[in-house]
């Protein structure tokens, strides 16, 4: 009876550690995507600043293009970069939390294995 409970606890802890590792990897991928978005927005903003004020600025939305002005496009790219940066920070906080939980689960798993011997 106790052996079944230990094996069930072992499976649960192992599942939790695997799931946490997958969530950490997924968070790293999301962080890379947001970092790329941030770099693109900052680069585009930098290029827009150097362009003439009298040019027509078009923004693609789905299958159509919207005519906008230079300040609106610059502020849009600033907002996109800021939003991506905030998402990166949130992902970092979540990663720290998940890593703490992973360490705790691994410790519990080791203790469970040691108690079984």
Swiss-Prot record:
Keywords: Chaperone, Cytoplasm. GO terms for cellular component: cytoplasm; prefoldin complex. It comes from the Eukaryota. Expressed in the distal cell tip of developing embryos. One of its GO terms (molecular function) is protein folding chaperone. Disruption phenotype: Worms exhibit defects in distal cell tip migration during gonadogenesis, reduced microtubule growth rate in embryos, and larvae arrest and lethality. Pfam families: Prefoldin_2 (PF01920). GO terms for biological process: gonad development; protein folding. It is found in: Cytoplasm. InterPro entries: PFD_beta-like, Prefoldin. Binds specifically to cytosolic chaperonin (c-CPN) and transfers target proteins to it. Binds to nascent polypeptide chain and promotes folding in an environment in which there are many competing pathways for nonnative proteins. Has a role in gonadogenesis. Belongs to the prefoldin subunit beta family. Heterohexamer of two PFD-alpha type and four PFD-beta type subunits. This is Probable prefoldin subunit 1. It comes from Caenorhabditis elegans. The lineage of its organism: Eukaryota, Metazoa, Ecdysozoa, Nematoda, Chromadorea.
């Amino acid at each position: 009876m106790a052996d079944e409970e230990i094996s069930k606890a072992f499976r649960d802890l192992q599942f939790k550690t695997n799931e946490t590792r997958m969530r950490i990897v997924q968070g790293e991928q999301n962080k890379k995507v947001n970092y790329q978005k941030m770099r693109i927005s900052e680069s585009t903003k930098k290029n827009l600043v150097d362009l003439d004020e009298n040019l027509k600025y078009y923004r693609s939305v789905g299958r159509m293009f919207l005519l906008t002005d230079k300040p609106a496009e610059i502020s849009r790219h600033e907002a996109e970069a800021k939003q991506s940066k905030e998402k990166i920070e949130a992902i970092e906080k979540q990663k720290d939390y998940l890593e703490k939980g992973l360490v705790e689960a691994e410790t519990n798993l080791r203790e469970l294995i040691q108690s079984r011997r």
